[in-house]
Amino acid sequence: MINYAHLKSQMIQLLDLLRSILYPNVFDAMEEAHSKEELEAAARRQLREILERIYREPPQYDDVIDTLFSKLPAIRDTLDTDVQAAYEGDPAATCREEVMLAYPAFEAISIFRIAHELYLMRVPMLPRMMTEYAHSLTGIDIHPGATIGPYFFIDHGTGVVIGETT
């Protein structure tokens, strides 16, 4: 039987690790300086544990893990455009780091971009858990199957819903 409370906790830790890998100078999930390799190893272990919990029949965990990690540079590139869109689109933004640390929309979008890649790999449950977690934090509800291009910015996003077919 799956302990869903523990699964959610693991998912939150995974997101923290992935954000630390994507933006090591902004986020630090391990609360002290660690190398990119150490962060990646911890995130890979965390993702493997989650996949082992949610799959009834063991798939190729390594394929899912390797594919997600191979997509991280592209996710980072797209998130950089999202940060740029917020910075340029909101006159109140004083710097890019402020967008990453203080804007709820960036949190929702960054979690969505990770969840979307897992959704495309047909990973069950985890992508939706991620975006619902973002929804609970930010008030922004983005379905993991939604198609969202680069330079995406939501200003004052409470109550925004983006469905898979929007």
What are the residue ranges of the model-derived segments?
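Terminal amphipathic alpha-helical/low-complexity segments used for targeting or macromolecular assembly
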Residues: 1-132
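Structural signal for interior beta-strand "rungs" in well-ordered beta-sheet cores
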Residues: 134-166
